[in-house]
Design a protein with these regions (language model features):
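Charged, gly/pro-rich active-site loop segments
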Residues: 1-11, 85-157
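Short, basic/aromatic recognition patches
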Residues: 2-28
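Hydrophobic small-molecule pocket/channel-lining residues, especially in calycin-type beta-barrels
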Residues: 14, 21, 27, 79-81, ...
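A generic alpha-helix structural signal
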Residues: 17-21, 67, 103-111
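Short secondary-structure boundary/capping segments
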Residues: 18-19, 48, 68, 118-120
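Short beta-strand segments
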Residues: 24-62, 68-70, 76-80, 88-92
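Generic structural signal for secondary-structure transition and capping sites
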Residues: 25-26, 75, 115, 135
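Short, intrinsically disordered, mixed-charge
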Residues: 71-76, 108-112
Length: 157
């Protein structure tokens, strides 16, 4: 990914949306929390992603640390792609669906993009619908300026 000129904001947005909509897109999901004893903990796990209606959709066990952190605190950071072609997303929890509550289109869309169907993995799975607040994308140091593509939940023109 080295060489050439830095991509324009428009090209970065096109590339970012293509990555988000790609089949079997996986993201690193970073969350943090403070436990009852006052000890801070950070957690990083890989999860499958679906990009549905401009939202990041994850599926995980309801009792997982990641689901607990997201549902308790609302904030999450997602990392997609290798370090020399990365997309970083800061997002907030918009909705949690149990398997039987999930809209059919969301569940089907997730299964189609992620390549697996959480509805076949047990009743404790949850869909987490995340609204992106900030999206950044860059490849090399020459793309650090202008890396922010979305701010406050709105694409920057």
């Amino acid at each position: 990914m080295t060489g050439g000129q830095p991509r324009t904001r428009e090209q970065r947005k096109v590339d970012t949306l293509a990555k988000l909509a790609a089949p079997a897109a996986d993201v690193w999901v970073a969350t943090a929390a403070v436990d009852a004893g006052g000890h801070a903990g950070s957690y990083l796990v890989p999860l499958s992603l679906a990009w549905i209606d401009q939202r990041a959709v994850l599926a995980t066990e309801a009792g997982s640390v990641t689901a607990g952190n997201i549902t308790s605190h609302g904030g999450v950071r997602l990392g997609l792609g290798p370090t020399r072609d990365v997309v970083m997303i800061d997002a907030e929890l918009e909705h949690v669906y149990s398997l039987d509550e999930a809209p059919a289109g969301l569940a089907r869309g997730y299964a189609a993009q992620a390549g697996w169907d959480p509805r076949k993995s047990g009743e404790s799975m949850r869909f987490l619908v995340l609204r992106p607040l900030r999206i950044q994308a860059w490849r090399e140091a020459d793309e650090l300026p202008g890396r922010t593509l979305m701010r406050g939940g709105a694409w920057i023109p």
